[in-house]
Amino acid sequence: MSIVEMGKNAKQAAKELAQANTELKNNVLHELEKSLLDNAEYILQQNQKDLDNAKKNNLSKAFVDRLTLTPARIESMAQGVRQIADFADPIGKIEKGFKHPKGMTISQIRVPLGVIAMIFESRPNVTIDAGALALKSGNAIILRGGSDALHTNIALKNIFQEVCEKHGLSKNIVQLVEDIARERVTELVTLDKYIDVIIPRGGKSLKKAIQQQATISMIETGAGICHTYIDEFADLDKAIKIVINAKTQRPGVCNALESLLVHQNIAEKFLPKLEIELAKYNVELRADNESLKYLGNAILATPEDWDTEYLDLVLSIKTVANINEAIEHINTHGSMHSECIVTESYTNTEIFLNEVDAAAVYANASTRFTDGSEFGFGGEIGISTQKLHARGPMGINELTTLKYIIRGNGQVRG
């Protein structure tokens, strides 16, 4: 099927879905939850094909981790779908209303965006998260995943479409671009006749390529050059715990720690202790000259390291003179995703939280919490790093827009 045909089908499916009531949408989602669990063996078989190809292509461990589905991860996907079903339906919600002096009533209500095109890389769970969020918020969605996850994505798409049709909804509510040629992406991001918004979920190169080609509004998500700043007033045991979690729990995700900033007054005491702990996880350290004085197995960082999202067990480290230098570095090199300060100083906490420009700013907690499920949104369609329309984890409400309904009785403007 051509991209144009997919766009036409999605537009029609969105019109039909806009008429679906909450009960029907929730029934579909509960059925999807059950179907994911019932078809776990089929999903894992298809996922194994992608994993075999990834290993043949010598892809990194972090990449393979993002690609891998397990029974536990399928269960987590199903739980996410259940959460989405349990959330209040935003469509038709009256955000505010008032009566005009001329007697008209004016209401602001939530409506679907329409047709969403989502382009993402190697995480197949996105197929289900994005599809479920789109359905609950009344949108049709066209997905274009990475070629490395094609078998898994097709399996998940098939399950989703079967459930939709079983409940009398169009299978075109969720479509997948199965042709992996790059030309199809260009066609997709210029299909402004049928698509209302593009959501790219991936690294800087993906977003840059789409920005250069797209003729459709875009919501940027994904790239996470996340920092943690260890202040001179930090509890060092707490700091080590936070850094280890943020860097090593799942290094291949966008909310993982990539760059560590350490106040010069504690670097000598803190860095050797941290290096011992990070060595247990085989984390490669790339440090500036000042930090190298206190590290035994680090290599000298290059200027490029401060702007790199490793998505792997690699960490850049820089010693800074004060909190102001830390904030300046973060606002220069960060991707406006998630940033953290570890400190027992109330004053420095407030300075950092107020002055760092990011979607999520933490005090004394791992950046790994920037996630739709952790924020209570169920699944997420992505983590927006821009400022317009949506910022941070994007759940159901972020996939809607506003519409004004004016009810009159013959009023005219004088």
Curated annotation (Swiss-Prot):
Superkingdom in the source lineage: Bacteria
Concerning Pfam families, the annotation shows: Aldedh
Q: Which InterPro entries match?
A: Ald_DH/histidinol_DH, Ald_DH_C, Ald_DH_N, Aldehyde_DH_dom, G-glutamylP_reductase_CS, Glu-5-SA_DH, GPR_dom
Q: Which GO terms describe its molecular function?
A: glutamate-5-semialdehyde dehydrogenase activity; NADP binding
BP GO terms, sorted: L-proline biosynthetic process
Q: Which UniProt keywords apply?
A: Amino-acid biosynthesis, Cytoplasm, NADP, Oxidoreductase, Proline biosynthesis
Family named by the database record: Belongs to the gamma-glutamyl phosphate reductase family.
| Protein name according to UniProt | Gamma-glutamyl phosphate reductase
Its taxonomic placement starts with: Bacteria, Pseudomonadati, Pseudomonadota, Gammaproteobacteria, Thiotrichales
